[in-house]
Design a protein with these regions (language model features):
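Short acidic loop-to-helix transition motifs that present clustered carboxylates
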Residues: 59-62, 122-125, 155, 180-182
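Acidic-basic catalytic patches of nuclease active cores, encompassing PD-(D/E)XK
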Residues: 72-122
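Domain-level recognition of nuclease-like catalytic cores that cleave nucleotide substrates
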Residues: 180-239
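Catalytic centers of nucleases
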Residues: 100-160
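Short secondary-structure transition/capping segments
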Residues: 78-79, 126-132, 185-186, 210-211
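Catalytic cores of nucleic-acid endonucleases
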Residues: 141-201
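Intrinsically disordered, low-complexity, charge-dense segments enriched in Lys/Arg
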Residues: 2, 78, 92, 180-187
Length: 239
């Protein structure tokens, strides 16, 4: 059902609306981490509303109101089965894009020029999710930019982003959602896999701070609210 994926609003449009809604209800002194999480939660809420709207349109389009109840129920069941896979695939593909766009929007709000790259991968190359200051700068001089890999949670395939630290000397892995399933064991796995710089939502970082200081020696781990300052410090060294 290509109609479903084509009918859902673009990720950028949903996040635009989420940002406007969040701006109108949060205080000006909110932390960067909380700001990002508020946008992420609002974007998720809006996306679910989009799903419901499109599913309703499909049902109204496909169901004949004159049909017998038995036939109608069978038709609904067939549509639901088909849609379940389509919805899951659409969520997966758009979820990755939404994370990078949310972070990009938030960084721009903090005065940091950046650009979502649009993930491209092959066996021979790796591209990050967000380039600072731009994709053009990334293409021209990979050593002179900051490259960010972005994940909403760590249930996602974080190992696929380890190459960012081989391709870009100024790189970081950023986890956005404060509902991320980060554990001590996962941090140890990341350390063994070669992850070098990690930003975690503030509440998760501080809940694990003791373990991080004691056992995580080969990863620079920071709270998410520190990211804008970290970027500015890196940029000052690159100029």
């Amino acid at each position: 059902m290509s109609f479903f994926s084509k009918s859902i609003r673009a990720v950028s449009d949903i996040i635009d609306e989420a940002v406007r809604n969040v701006r109108g209800r949060i205080s000006s002194d909110v932390s960067f981490s909380e700001y990002v999480n508020e946008i992420e939660k609002e974007a998720h809420r809006l996306y679910l509303l989009e799903e419901k709207r499109v599913v309703r349109e499909i049902l109204l389009k496909e169901i004949n109101p004159e049909s017998r109840l038995k036939d109608t129920l069978q038709k609904v069941a067939d549509i639901v089965v088909e849609l379940s896979t389509v919805i899951a695939n659409t969520r997966r593909s758009r979820g990755g894009m939404s994370s990078e766009y949310i972070l990009s929007y938030a960084l721009k709000e903090y005065g940091i020029d950046n650009e979502p790259v649009g993930r491209r991968r092959s066996k021979k190359s790796y591209y990050p999710d967000v380039a600072i200051p731009s994709k053009e700068a990334l293409e021209k001089n990979p050593n002179g930019v900051i490259a960010l890999a972005v994940k909403r949670t760590l249930r996602e395939r974080w190992r696929e982003d380890i190459p960012i630290f081989r391709h870009f000397p100024n790189a970081a892995f950023v986890c956005l959602s404060d509902s991320a399933d980060i554990t001590e064991g996962k941090l140890l796995d990341m350390q063994e896999e070669g992850l070098r710089v990690l930003f975690l939502p503030d509440n998760l970082y501080f809940s694990l701070k003791g373990f991080i200081e004691e056992d995580i020696k080969r990863i620079e781990v920071y709270e998410l609210s520190y990211l804008p300052r970290w970027i500015r410090a890196k940029l000052s060294l690159l100029r």
